[in-house]
From Swiss-Prot:
Pfam families: Anth_synt_I_N, Chorismate_bind. Mg(2+) binds at E361, E497. Keywords: Amino-acid biosynthesis, Aromatic amino acid biosynthesis, Lyase, Magnesium, Metal-binding, Plasmid, Tryptophan biosynthesis. Its cofactor is Mg(2+). This is Anthranilate synthase component 1. Belongs to the anthranilate synthase component I family. GO terms for molecular function: anthranilate synthase activity; metal ion binding. Its EC number is 4.1.3.27. Binds 1 Mg(2+) ion per subunit.
Amino acid sequence: MKKKPYQIEIIQKKAPYHPDPTMIFNHLCESRSATLLLETAEVNKKKDLESIMIIDSAIRISSKKNLVKLKPLSINGEEILLALKKRIPKKIEIYEKNKNIILVFPKIEKNLDEDKKLFSLSVFDAFRFMIKIFENKEKKSKAMFFGGLFSYDLSQFFESLPKLKGNQKCSNFCFYLAETLLVLDHQKKTCLIQNSLFTKNANEKKRIKERSIEIEKKLNEKLKSIPKVKITDINLTSNMNNFEYGSIIKKLQKLIQKGEIFQVVPSRKFYLPCPNPLSAYQKLKKSNPSPYMFFMQDKDFTLFGASPESSLKYDEKTRKIELYPIAGTRPRGRTEDGNLDLDLDSRIELEMRTNHKELAEHLMLVDLARNDLARICKPGSRYVSDLVKVDKYSHVMHLVSKVIGELKEGLDALHAYASCMNMGTLTGAPKVRAMQLIAEYEKEKRGSYGGAIGYFTDLGNLDTCITIRSAYVENIATIQAGAGIVYNSIPEDEVNESLNKAQAVINAIKNAHY
């Protein structure tokens, strides 16, 4: 690569703070595509910490198979692609159509050892090429901010997995490079508008400055209310009834008993109409506040959710990488009228904490997380913190742990994600064989479910959650949920667990449309 000739210019403006990010998102973004809301909250206190919104995007980056499509959404984005074309290695084919660029990456040999596979040219390099074009001399936070999703099916590019059909338009990954960010710090009660200028074009700089002023003015206005859409018939359907799902669980248990795998996480899908996803997200956030909450508005789909589980988190300064395995689930203790019974709730928690099956399953997945990190972390740097604690949500409680390690030199956050995907709590162990069996029995792509949503930056930081407790919407909402199966699982309990996990999202959609 040649020396970086391009500088990123950051334009920042303070703006009035407002405590309701969902209302702000509705007010500023309405139904525009390539917009994204990412939120974090403190689990136990249920307090909002930070909300990041992509208000305007410069480029939409998506991938299917070994192709990456880069679509400019402004002159700012077009300038990046003009520079990018000059930086693409000859091993990668490049096509242009209507200002879009399509990159064709060589297919990865599946029989390569893990290290060679990790360093092979891959679709992840599309992001690295863009980052290498620019200098961020002042090390401004979020100067290049990529927000979006990695689908579960992205792993097919790297592993020998069955080819499946899917009815969803969800790409293997879909990310937006932010042009205009809004960052809300709920602890300090501050609001910052940040624009990233990737060009020296004077007219584009003028437009972006005017856009920043326009957003500030809008934030001084009374925020628009989220429109209500009423539905009289809101039937819940599924791709598997209880008997069918239970039958798959029993078949997989036989394979566990034969020693083919130790654990596996089959899932099923629930469907219901959802004409107003943002209203449903608002209800979900209120009823089930979670460490990670997200609302992604794409031209092909809307994705929203409240996930309890971090996928992968990486801090470039410390080079610390974190996994947060969740395994072990119980419903909250409630009376017949739905109120929380604290005594019953504590007894359920005690039973879960001391249940041999749940503890064995949880520790198996903690060990899998340790193994995932072993490939990419410095020897001796891995450790487990917060072993087997309990996080509680509106409908369920979970056993959780945190596994931490220090990333090896020469690797970045995208190497780490590629090595660890998909997370063991959504696949099983051994991971690749579990994913093969999931494909065989589920018979269709998972799409966004079980992948990850979040962001990474040019400075190397990455923060993602597993895409669970979520709804993927193309007019109809698809809510997918699974259960971790081990040799002594009780199929009826696991069938109920899959519905319990989906219930918070189902209820939010129903309550938003009554």
